[in-house]
């Protein structure tokens, strides 16, 4: 319990320091989303993914004072970061001792891509960062994505309907907060369910009824929400184009290196402990989701004024964080050896890059 409280205090204190700065930064998305919440509080419309704005308005409206929306945004995003680090600690502790889980979760709280040589000490733009500090919807969706990934790892095609309905509700909440991660997870999740179904399908037509119900409960609500969001975006003139690497090249002159610097720790765990890692279904799912997310990031773009926004990057950030977590789970369960210490050292290097990044955010440099 002490470890969780300590992690929560570190995460909360860091978040308060960062987010209070982000509200005043022209490079941050906080002010835009607070403006959306303010418009909603005064009877205006909502963006297609609106859960954060609704929460901000709901928390601030009873106070009805200047600055209440800003404080609500800081409170909600801080709570999300605290939830993320506590969930991370609990997941890693399932495979190892509390002390190791504590330090791993602490490192993951700050982990960012390793330093590069072409824009030192910048580590965010152009890389696949496991942590995001400037976009409130990405911050808030992370704990939901964490729970959703856990559900995806354990759900079977013959699960009780209440379990499938719970997973479907989580999927819907994630879509309404920020849909990108769900768009990368769903193909992998459905493929995993199909493979589990192939291995254990009961004989006869009756054997298909429960899997069909599970799929409907899982996909139905999210599919409806995604269709509604697509229609809203289409009405504003937004579109999707296949334009390989066009957006990514704007932010990285060395895309393969950017990718390697972003996933150095998970790659090291996979390479150094392959025999253990290959037996872990959650790790395989995490890698597959990241692959789909990176393909979306690399191939898709929004023509027009939103072209440079990189809105197809978001799924890869969330997916990479969850890959880092599952890689830490494998590593903490592995026997202590020089290989393990080498992998932990890489996580430390990722955390150091993140600490420098967070320090620059707090100092107002970024």
Task: Enumerate the predicted regions with their spans.
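Signature aromatic-anchored transmembrane alpha helix within multi-pass, membrane-resident enzymes
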Residues: 216-219, 332-361
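Hydrophobic/aromatic-rich transmembrane helices and adjacent perimembrane loops
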Residues: 183, 305-333
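Start-transfer (signal-anchor) and selected internal transmembrane alpha helices
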Residues: 1-16, 96-105
């Amino acid at each position: 319990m002490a470890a969780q409280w300590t992690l929560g205090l570190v995460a909360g204190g860091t978040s308060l320091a960062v987010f209070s700065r982000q509200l005043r930064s022209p490079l941050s998305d906080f002010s835009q989303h607070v403006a959306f919440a303010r418009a909603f509080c005064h009877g205006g419309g909502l963006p297609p993914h609106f859960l954060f704005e609704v929460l901000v308005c709901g928390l601030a409206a009873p106070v009805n004072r200047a600055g209440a929306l800003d404080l609500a945004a800081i409170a909600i995003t801080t709570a999300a970061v605290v939830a993320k680090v506590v969930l991370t600690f609990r997941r890693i502790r399932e495979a190892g001792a509390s002390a190791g889980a504590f330090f791993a979760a602490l490192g993951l709280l700050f982990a960012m891509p390793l330093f590069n040589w072409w824009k030192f000490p910048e580590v965010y733009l152009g890389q696949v960062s496991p942590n995001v500090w400037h976009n409130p919807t990405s911050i808030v969706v992370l704990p939901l994505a964490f729970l959703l990934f856990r559900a995806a790892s354990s759900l079977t095609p013959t699960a009780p309907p209440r379990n499938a309905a719970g997973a479907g509700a989580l999927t819907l909440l994630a879509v309404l907060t920020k849909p990108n991660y769900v768009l990368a997870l769903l193909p992998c999740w459905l493929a995993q369910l199909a493979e589990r179904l192939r291995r254990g399908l009961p004989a006869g037509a009756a054997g298909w009824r429960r899997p069909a119900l599970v799929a409907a409960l899982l996909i139905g609500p999210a599919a409806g929400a995604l269709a509604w969001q697509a229609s809203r975006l289409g009405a504003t003139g937004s579109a999707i184009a296949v334009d390989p690497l066009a957006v990514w090249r704007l932010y990285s002159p060395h895309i393969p290196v950017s990718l390697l610097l972003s996933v150095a720790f998970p790659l090291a765990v996979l390479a150094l402990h392959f025999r253990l890692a290959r037996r872990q279904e959650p790790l395989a799912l995490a890698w597959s989701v990241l692959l789909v997310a990176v393909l979306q990031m690399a191939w898709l773009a929004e023509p027009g004024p939103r072209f440079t926004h990189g809105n197809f990057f978001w799924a890869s950030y969330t997916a990479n964080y969850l890959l880092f977590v599952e890689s830490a789970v494998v590593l903490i369960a592995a026997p202590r050896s020089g290989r393990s210490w080498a992998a932990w050292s890489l996580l430390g290097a990722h955390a150091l890059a993140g600490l420098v990044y967070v320090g620059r955010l707090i100092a107002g440099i970024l």
